[in-house]
Amino acid sequence: MQIFDSVQKTKVTFEPIREGEASIYVCGPTVYDDAHLGHARSSLAFDLLSRTLKALGYKVIMAKNFTDIDDKIIKKVEETGKSMQEITSYYIQRYLDEMEQLGVQRADIEPKATESLDAIEQMIQTLIDKDFAYVVSNGDVYFDTSKDSHYGDISHKVSDDDTQSRVEHNSEKRNPRDFALWKACKGEEDICFGAPFSSGRPGWHIECSAMIEKYFKGNGQYSIDIHGGGADLLFPHHENEAAQSRCATGHELAKYWMHNGFVQINGEKMSKSLGNSFFLKDALEVYGGEVLRYYLNSVHYRNDFNFNEEDLQTAKKRLDKLYRLKKRVLPGKASTVNKAFKQALLNAMSDDLNISIALAVIDEMIAETNEKLDTDPKNKALKKETIANIEFIDTLLGFGGKEPFSYFQIGVDEALKEKIEILLQERTEAKKAKDFATSDAIRNELIDMGISIMDTAEGTVWEKA
C-alpha cells in the first residue's frame, strides 16, 4: 500500500514495524464542546485507512485519544459550574454516538489523559533526568528544544518567533520555542493533580506522547507505524510530540505521519471566530450519517474540503444510485464479490486512499449492472453477485449497508413520518375492507406528499420519491 508521509512529503510504500500488523494513533478531540465537521473529516479519513489496511490483510490496532484535561475544559467548568468529569463524559459520549452515525469504527484503544497521568509524569521525569526538560521557579516544566538537534524535522517550519512563543508566556523559558510539559497550579480554584515537580496539570503535547508509549510496544526504532491527525496539528503539536518521545525513549515516535486537509464552509476556512463552525450534530440531523460520510469522504483526504449544499446534493445523488440498484437486486442472498471489481477498489484505496477512483469504479459497476438487468431482469446470478459487491463496498468504504427503504427515509422529519404511518395504517384497513377507492385515494395523497409506497410480503414500505 502507498501512503503519503507528511515528513518525507511524498508517497511511500507502507512497511510496518511488525510484519502483518499496523499500529495507528490518531489525535482525537478535546472534549469541551460538540464535535464539528473538522473532527468528522479526520475521523472518516483514518477510518478509511483502517478499513483499507484490514481489507489488505493487516491486523490493525488503532488508538484515538480524548483530551480531557485542557484550559478550554477548565473554562467550561467555570462557566457551567459542572465538574470536569461531568463535562468530559458528556461530550465523549456525544462524540462516540455521532461517530457511530457516521459509520466510523470504534478505535481499539480510546485513552484519556486523566487515566494516563502516571505515564505522563513518568515521561516528564525521564526528560528532566536526561536534561531535556527543566523546572522553573513556579513549578512549570518546559521542554528544552535547543537540546534536540532534530527539532523541526517533522514540520520543517520552526523559527524563534513561532506560534509557541506567542502562546506560552514565561520569562524563565530558556528559548522562545520551548513548550510546557507541565503547568503548575495558578491558585486554589485551579484544577490540579499532584506530581513530583509541582501540583498542576500536563501540557497538551505530552499527553499524546505518554499515551502512545503506554499502549504501544514499538520495535526499538519506532513506537508506532502511523501517527495521524488534521493538517493543523502538524505544528506545533506533532512536532512537539515527536521531540518529547524521541528524547525520552531514544527512538522515533512514528515511522509515518499522515494528515488530512481542512474543512471550509462555502469557500472559507471553518472556525468559531468566523462564526461558520458547523456542528456535526446539526449536519447529521439534516443529512443523515451515511450521506454525510459519503460526501465528506468524496474528496481526497489530503485536500481541503469545501462544504457546500450543491456538492452535497451531487454526492447524495450518486449514493442514491447505489441504493436504487440495491433495491433492484433485493431480496436475495449474496454470492461472491466480483474479483475484478474487488481488485479495482483495493487498487484505488491502496494508492494513498484514492477515493475518487474508488467511487468511479462503483459508479461504473452500477451503470453496467443496471444495463444488464434492463436486458435480463431475472438474472439471479447477477443479482447475488451485486449484493456481494455492495456488501464489500460497505466493508471497505462504510456505505451501502442500509436497507434501501430505510435509506430513502432519511431527511423526513418525525411529524411527517408519523402522518405517513397513520395514512398507511388507514390504507391497510381500507384494503382489508376491500375499500379500494379509499386505498387508492390514500396512495395518491402520499404521492402528492412526495412519498412512494410498495406493498411487500412483510407489509407496506415507503420512501421519499
UniProtKB/Swiss-Prot annotation:
Motif segment ('KMSKS' region): 269-273
Region named Disordered: 153-173
GO cellular component: cytosol
Main location: cytoplasm
Any GO BP annotation: cysteinyl-tRNA aminoacylation
Alphabetical keyword list: Aminoacyl-tRNA synthetase, ATP-binding, Cytoplasm, Ligase, Metal-binding, Nucleotide-binding, Protein biosynthesis, Zinc
EC number assigned by the record: 6.1.1.16
Localization: Cytoplasm
Protein name: Cysteine--tRNA ligase
Gene source species: Sulfurovum sp. (strain NBC37-1)
Gene name linked to the record: cysS
